[in-house]
Swiss-Prot record:
Cellular compartments annotated: Endosome membrane; Microsome membrane
Record protein name field: Protein VAC14 homolog
Top-level taxon in the UniProt lineage: Eukaryota
Domain notes: The C-terminal domain (residues 523-782) mediates pentameric interactions and is necessary for the formation and maintenance of the PI(3,5)P2 regulatory complex.
Family, per entry: Belongs to the VAC14 family.
Ranges occupied by HEAT repeats: 5-42, 89-126, 171-208, 212-249, 438-475, 558-596
Gene field: VAC14
Amino acid sequence: MNAERDLAPLAPSVVRALNDKLYEKRKVAALEIEKLVREFVAQNNTSQVKHVILILSQEFALSQHPHSRKGGLIGLAACSIALGKDSGLYLKELIEPVLTCFNDADSRLRYYACEALYNIVKVARGSVLPHFNVLFDGLSKLAADPDPNVKSGSELLDRLLKDIVTESNQFDLVGFIPLLRERIYSNNQYARQFIISWILVLESVPDINLLDYLPEILDGLFQILGDNSKEIRKMCEVALGEFLKEIKKNPSSVKFAEMANILVIHCQAADDLIQLTAMCWMREFIQLAGRVMLPYSSGILTAVLPCLSYDDRKKNIKEVANVCNQSLMKLVIPEDDEMDEAKQSITLSAEPNPEEPVSKPEAASTGSLDVSGDSSVSNASVCTVTSSERIQVTLNLDGIVQVLDCHLHDTSIGMMTRIAVLKWLYHLYIKTPRKMFRHTDSLFPILLRTLSDESDEVILKDLEVLAEIASSPAGQTEGYGPSEAAEPRPGQVELHVPIRNSQLSSSGPKGLECSPSTPTMNSYFYKFMINLLKRFSSERKLLETRGAFIIRQLCLLLNTENIFHSMADILLREEDLKFASTMVHTLNTILLTSSELFQLRNQLKDLRTPESRNLFCCLYRSWCHNPVTTVSLCFLTQNYKHAYDLIQKFGDLEVTVDFLTEVDKLVQLIECPIFTYLRLQLLDVKNNPYLIKALYGLLMLLPQSSAFQLLSHRLQCVPNPELMQSADGSRASASSRRPASSTIDYTELLQHFDKVQSKHLEVRHQRAGRAEQPERRVVL
């Protein structure tokens, strides 16, 4: 009985009914409690109201006995109904015990708790919003409840709460975000569905700006996007689409920088939907935020570049990644080359930044993920920022180069990715050459190795980068000279090309020391030529399969004369004589047959200028590594007497199958259009006796082969000199009309030829283990 007095003002019959196992009796007791509380409200007796709620909470709802807990729940709901609009004054006391019952092991009790809370919330309406977080927390747990009745009850309560939030303007979003951020990482499907449904509701409320807090929940949203449930994935897609729609409508208020790294992470996701969605977001971010995204370029490239090599199964991702890559590349501007110096300026913070936003892209009217569309790209941020903020948006070139270098070293990456990496390097050397040359020494080796790539497209793009490095004015500085080219060089007096005054003033002494043969290129040009030849020497297969292709492309990208001049210069000092001979043969074939070298051939054919004569001498000294190519060079330059003198010396050489094969090829070449002028000169027998002698010399060297027959037939067509007397007898040949040719010391050139061939003979003997070779001479 003492217990009954302790529970006053509740009557003993009410107490007994609340503890009864039958629902009907508990319901009758609840009606009595409702009546009692109404009387207290009418009397304005708040203390008694609080006392009743306390009793129902402590003695019933939180009781150890399940039936008592059920009675307490229905009693608290009855109190709320009786209080009506005044229930807001007691919500904390009413809600807390009910929420505690959400964790009860008995599913029936959890259901009654849902029912009770529904009645409490229905009465209180907007007054429950200050308690929204605890209600949301409780509901998020019930959303994953295994009992279907409990889940159904929680959904009913959930809809009611959403209606209240939608119609109210008092929702505390700031207080709710931490809880949402925590709950969004739940792995339970039902909890995720619950979270997404609430995000969609909050997005739809005009007075709630959830976009401001998107950085807090974006990562969680992308994780939910990978859920196994198609329904949840679809809901998440819709939510992300709505956010993207809002971002496009009002980009100036979006915190792009805070979300950039989140997108970078999910652009690398294994799940296709997550990756595609993140990539679409990245595309929009780059195009809307512009240069605000530059500090995150290295991360973006890490995510985007591998996607460029995807096959058709991931075509959508590949296309969007390509747009991202192109858009990001356009953000790099020449001013980035000066940014470091600008930041170091003391007065810069007080000065306006010269970079002004170009234009604001028109906001898209839909938030759907457009895979193939490429909206207009802006080279500047659409966000309205102060000058000091713009100064901080700088290009992290070190990070970008590190990523590009890493991808070039990775042999597993696809062809399109390698091409994109090389395009980036080329673009950076064009836009920010001064900064890029700080990285050239580290990039140079991998760029050279890339010349061995299987793809012609990769090699072409690689050559463009190397050519830009070799020709950029930024490379001709005191700080960036290659060490290899600074070595003393034998024969420098003879091989040195005259330097124009303008080039002297621009290049400086450092540049001349590094590359005396190539004054129009920078200090890296000569280094490039040295290392390219080293590459060919160590990789003979590369020389055989791609050597001509590489050199011909370089002739399109760089000065042809400089390429041949420098390579001949380097080969002059080559210790591997067999390689030198092979390389000279390759260069000679290119010189005589490639359309890219038409102008250089014309220049050498006439030898009218000091530069052309100097080039001839330089080429000749290296061409001596290969006797037949030396003769062909003399034919090209119309030095027929010297060609004859050389052929006379062939009798002292070791005649091998390779040697005869080269003579055979030279005969075939003489029949080609390139030597049309030479064949026409055979008509002028009187003025070209040494041409005819030289050709007869080749004929005598050849065995009775098809080439022998070809040359023999050609020589049979040479007219009788006496028959040609009716022609202008005073006419001199082209070679005899060149007064400048007398400035070339042909005797010294012949001596040089003898020295080089003696070295070759010595090396061959050493290889064969022969001490001596008997002299053999062909008398012509």
